[in-house]
From Swiss-Prot:
Cofactor(s) annotated in UniProt: Mg(2+)
Entry's family note: Belongs to the adenylosuccinate synthetase family.
Chain sites annotated for binding IMP: 13-16, 38-41, 130, 144, 224, 239, 303
Catalytic reaction(s) noted: IMP + L-aspartate + GTP = N(6)-(1,2-dicarboxyethyl)-AMP + GDP + phosphate + 2 H(+)
PROSITE patterns: ADENYLOSUCCIN_SYN_1 (PS01266), ADENYLOSUCCIN_SYN_2 (PS00513)
Pathway it works in: Purine metabolism; AMP biosynthesis via de novo pathway; AMP from IMP: step 1/2
PANTHER family in alphabetical order: ADENYLOSUCCINATE SYNTHETASE
The protein's name: Adenylosuccinate synthetase
Binding positions for GTP per the UniProt entry: 12-18, 40-42, 305, 331-333, 413-415
Subcellular locations according to the entry: Cytoplasm
């Protein structure tokens, strides 16, 4: 299989950035296909820490082409700020090695403001968004009133499009008690951004098709996790895009047959940010300890992540909904030293045992985890780079996860460092 799709197999924050960076050494092109700058990830390379949000991890690899696909919602200012920050760290970024789909939807300041107003007004019922305008931008895309990158190339044709956008947003703003927005202000802002953004614009579906036919290896980089998918996740506590592997085709303009191996990323435990059901959440000292060891705070927002035991039911479900061929298991080292480790192997709902997470919000909140206790290990797994470096009990834990989710572990990560990775099966050669 020449192409590889990387998706999160939990609620995001699984360590996709490191795995994508590790795989990108073998890829020619790295493509983002959904989400926006709400999904941050941290990479540590030769002791230097890089924090990415919107840009594909491939930008950190010299000679690789990084691409932002049409399935992404694109904040122009966030993009320019991130490029500038990475350039200050010595990363070479230019239109030569970074391309952006011309039909990508733009996130504007009005989207961010609306996002924040809604979350504030919802109070206890808030979803827990990053308030970066992701959802409102996707709403405008589906509502056929979005401004897209290609629109900046024809400023004379922009006013009617802005008027259509504001007919919707100013009505909302009146209802929220906010002042209306003048279309001229948006036009002036976009006109100022156009010369900075348009050099990156590309007909991405055509570019990728040409590269695929040339035999280039393409790595599709997903954001968030499959359990945040707007259709298959814990709705309504989800993101506003499809995060499952099938979106790699839709979000880039490539056909489904162009997507090869699907690699699912999951932690050796479970975390979640924001509100929503979490069957294995540990609201005790063990959960706090996992959070401290794993440094479980959001890269972009700094929000504390909720922590719990590994949920094999959920990962097995995402293996199916994403068509995952192999898993990359991360942060195994965080579990070093625990006397025993619990793994969720099933649920109990209203007195009955079930083997999947139900779709209903109420039912999701009522499920109770059924645990299997596994013996822990005392020896460290941190920085291990081969199976021989791992304690026998840690290997047993990995093997048990494989059995429970019905999917082999292809990669094992034992620290944030790029080289601390154990390869079992190379996704590009599977």
């Amino acid at each position: 299989m020449a192409n590889v799709v990387v998706v999160g197999a939990q609620w995001g924050d699984e360590g996709k950035g490191k795995i994508v960076d590790w795989l990108s050494e073998q890829a020619d092109i790295v493509v983002r296909f959904q989400g926006g700058h709400n999904a941050g990830h941290t990479l540590v390379i030769n002791g230097e820490t890089y924090k990415l949000a919107l840009l594909p991890s491939g930008v950190l690899r010299p000679s690789k082409l990084a691409v932002i696909g049409n399935g992404v919602v694109f904040d122009p200012q966030a993009f320019l700020d991130e490029v500038k920050k990475l350039q200050a760290q010595g990363v070479a970024i230019s239109p030569e090695n970074l391309r952006v789909a011309e039909n990508v939807t733009l996130i504007l300041p009005l989207h961010r403001e609306l996002d924040a107003q809604r979350e504030t007004a919802a109070k206890a019922g808030a979803i827990g968004t990053t308030q970066r305008g992701i959802g409102p931008a996707y709403e405008d895309k589906v509502g056929r009133r979005a401004i897209r990158l290609m629109d900046l190339a024809d400023l004379a044709a922009l006013p009617p499009k802005i008027d259509r956008l504001l007919a919707h947003h100013n009505a909302l703003r009146r209802g929220l008690g906010l002042p209306e927005i003048d279309g001229a202000a948006i036009l002036n802002e976009l006109a100022a951004l156009a010369p900075q953004l348009l050099p990156y614009a590309e007909t991405v579906w055509r570019l990728l098709d040409i590269k695929r036919r040339e035999g280039k290896r393409i790595l599709f980089e997903g954001a968030q996790g499959a359990l945040l998918d707007v259709d298959h996740g814990t709705y309504p506590y989800v993101t506003s895009s499809n995060t499952v592997a099938a979106q790699a085709a839709t979000g880039t303009g490539m056909g489904p047959s162009s997507v090869g191996y699907v690699l699912g990323i999951c932690k050796a435990y479970t975390t979640r940010v924001g509100a929503g059901p979490f069957p294995t959440e540990l609201k005790n000292e063990i959960g706090e300890e996992i959070g401290r060891r794993g440094k479980e705070f959001g890269v972009n927002t700094g929000r504390k992540r909720r922590c719990g035991w590994f949920d094999a039911v959920l990962v097995r479900q995402t293996v199916r909904t994403c068509g995952i061929h192999g898993l990359a298991l991360t942060k195994l080292d965080i579990l070093d030293g625990f006397e025993t480790i619990e793994v969720c192997v099933g649920y109990r709902l209203d007195g009955k045992e079930i083997d999947h997470l139900p779709a209903g919000e109420g039912a999701q909140a009522r499920v109770e985890p059924i645990y299997e206790t596994i013996e822990g290990w005392k020896e460290p797994t941190a920085n291990a780079r081969s199976w021989a470096d791992l304690p026998a009990q840690a290997i047993k834990y990995v093997r048990r996860i494989e059995e429970l989710v019905g999917c082999p572990v292809a990669l094992l990560s034992t620290s944030p460092e790029r080289e601390d990775t154990i390869l079992v099966q190379n996704p590009f050669e599977a």
